[in-house]
Amino acid sequence: MTEHGKHAFHVRDDHGILVRPALASDVPHIQRLIAPYVDRRILLGKENVALYGSIQQFRIAEGPDGTPIGCGALAVFWDDIAEVRTLALDEQWIHKRVGHRMLEALEHDARELGVARIFCLTFEVDFFAKHGYLEIGESVVSPDVYAELVRSSDEGVAEFLDLARVKPNTLGNTRMLKNL
């Protein structure tokens, strides 16, 4: 992590970028940010009601002028595992380290919550590999935990477990995991 301390992500960096917790009023911005990726079938679309219901999981990256330029969420699955999801940037801000800063903030949140491992389902294998994520195959949870998780209605949990019912949504994606 390049910043230090609990409030490190609540200040603008040298490029004027601020990563902060999302507000309910950010939902239209999240929809705007994910729309190009949904159109290209890189991300699944989300209804506004789902975004409002999970807004506390999201972080927003603001550009120097205060406009939201990135979003990402951290969803906890179990006592030791969470998923980075809905990580998206305004395409003008790709390759300008905003994604790195967003991921660092979400990993910071995971550590604050006591989570030991972070999962992601991604087409951006190189990006996540640079941050220490490794490709995974079979289940990385015990049979008892699997039996609990398989009852979840959360699509992200189903993707983590690699369940057949979500296979059409995950074709071409790589399942990756990082130990914090």
Language model: regions and residue ranges:
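Conserved active-site alpha-helix within GNAT-family acetyltransferase domains
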Residues: E112, A116, T122-V150
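C-terminal "cap" of GNAT-fold acetyltransferases
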Residues: V141-L180
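Short amphipathic alpha-helix that is part of the acyltransferase structural core
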Residues: E3-G45, E62, T67, G172-L180
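Conserved acetyl-CoA-binding loop-helix of GNAT-fold acetyltransferases
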Residues: L89, H95-H108, F119-C120
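A generic "binding-loop/recognition-motif" signal
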Residues: D26, D80, F123-E124
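Short, hinge-like loop/turn segments at secondary-structure boundaries
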Residues: Y37-V38, E135-E138, D154
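A conserved beta-strand-loop-helix scaffold within acyl/acetyltransferase catalytic domains
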Residues: I42-P64, G70-L89
